[in-house]
UniProtKB/Swiss-Prot annotation:
Key words of the record: DNA damage, DNA recombination, DNA repair, Metal-binding, Zinc, Zinc-finger
Ranges where the Toprim domain occurs: 81-176
Species classification: Bacteria, Pseudomonadati, Acidobacteriota, Terriglobia, Terriglobales
Top-level taxon of origin: Bacteria
Function: May play a role in DNA repair. It seems to be involved in an RecBC-independent recombinational process of DNA repair. It may act with RecF and RecO.
Protein name stated in the entry: Recombination protein RecR
GO molecular function list: DNA binding; zinc ion binding
Length: 199
């Protein structure tokens, strides 16, 4: 095993903790940082420090933000009564890319996953329930992933929210645009057929 000087070994070990970064990638990144200018290395360290010091969760929707409420919840041009419920803050970017959604969001910060010890108490639903109970929401779009965990989470939320008499909708799933039907799996094809619409 290659031995590195303590500062290099420590940086490699910290980089390995990032998702998708193995030992070799961590070593490449560490050597890249070492070869960078001092200003670039300090800018990177400062950005990481600022990330932890300045970002927090929006008190309304749980999105990651540097202002509270976040830019979506405080926007006068957004439909505040239409709420898209997503698993993670990164899902917001996917919805925003469509440029077809003008509502606001609620971030759960996870999905139900009993095998990984994630139960309903781990999802951030308290302020979502409060918004619905106060009559501030007309429709909730459940935009969890079409995975076992995402479906379980959507079903749990539907059961939890249905008694509050709010309109609940689920994002459609089906055949991806540009794909060949021959290669679509059975579950996707079933959902596409069930979610068909009039022309």
């Amino acid at each position: 095993m290659t031995r590195f000087a303590e500062p290099m070994a420590r940086l490699i070990e910290e980089l390995r903790k990032l998702p998708g970064i193995g030992t070799r990638s961590a070593q490449r990144l560490a050597f890249h940082i070492l070869r960078s200018s001092t200003a670039d290395a300090e800018a990177l360290a400062g950005a990481v420090r600022d990330l932890k010091a300045q970002l927090r969760l929006c008190s309304v929707c749980n999105n990651i933000t540097d202002v509270d409420p976040c830019v979506f919840c405080s926007s006068p041009t957004r439909n505040q009564r239409l709420v898209c419920v997503v698993e993670e803050p990164t899902n917001i970017a996917a919805v925003e890319k469509t440029r077809g959604y003008n509502g606001v969001y609620h971030v759960l910060h996870g999905t139900l996953s009993p095998l990984h010890g994630v139960g309903p108490e781990h999802l951030r639903t308290v302020n979502l329930l409060a918004r619905v109970e106060r009559g501030e929401v007309d429709e909730l779009i459940l935009a969890t992933s079409p995975t076992v965990e995402g479906e379980a989470t959507a079903n749990y939320l539907a059961d939890l929210l249905r008694p509050l008499r709010v309109r609940l909708t689920r994002i459609a799933t089906g055949v991806p645009a540009g794909s060949d039907i021959e290669y679509v799996d059975e579950v996707t094809m079933t959902r596409a057929l069930e979610g068909r619409r009039e022309l």
